[in-house]
């Protein structure tokens, strides 16, 4: 999976909103066409409103991906961003089932999973319920240090991955 996150740019930095969407769609389709040739997915990551000025929630992503309609582009969700943007993470995952191709996990404080207050039991139960078969990757800060973050992430994955 090739992940497109902040690389997509911001509407506020474009000439106009129309130009932004036109350019984003054109380039995503170009990437996805190439990805299809290589049997790879393009995952469009939803990023919270404090870091990106568009495509923040699962619903934003689903709406845009349905409009775009490319078979090699799917939805990439990240628990850290979902904690900020989604009123109901379980419902958002359920609604995203058809397009969800990649998941990042980090806790509410962006540390390794289990450090903050995220309900990962519910997240992994929901992923099981929607028959999600894609990858789950830890994307967390190396805090308090890389060794601790790494070992705690492995412990977390051993608990939830089966």
Task: Give short role names for the model-derived ranges.
Residues 1-74:
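Active-site acidic/histidine proton-transfer and metal-coordination neighborhood
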């Amino acid at each position: 999976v090739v992940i497109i996150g902040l690389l997509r740019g911001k509407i506020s930095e474009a000439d106009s909103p129309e130009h932004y969407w036109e350019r984003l769609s054109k380039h995503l389709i170009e990437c996805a066409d190439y990805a299809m040739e290589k049997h790879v997915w393009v995952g469009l990551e939803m990023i919270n409103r404090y870091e990106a000025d568009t495509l923040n929630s699962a619903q934003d992503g689903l709406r845009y991906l349905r409009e775009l309609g490319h078979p090699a582009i799917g939805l990439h969700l990240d628990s850290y961003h979902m904690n900020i943007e989604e009123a109901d993470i379980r419902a958002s995952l359920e609604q995203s089932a058809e397009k969800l191709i990649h998941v990042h996990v980090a806790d509410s404080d962006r540390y390794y999973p289990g450090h903050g207050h995220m309900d990962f039991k519910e997240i992994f139960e929901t992923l099981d319920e929607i028959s999600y078969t894609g990858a789950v990757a830890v994307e967390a800060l190396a805090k308090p240090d890389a060794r601790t973050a790494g070992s705690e992430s492995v412990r977390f994955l051993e608990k939830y991955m089966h």
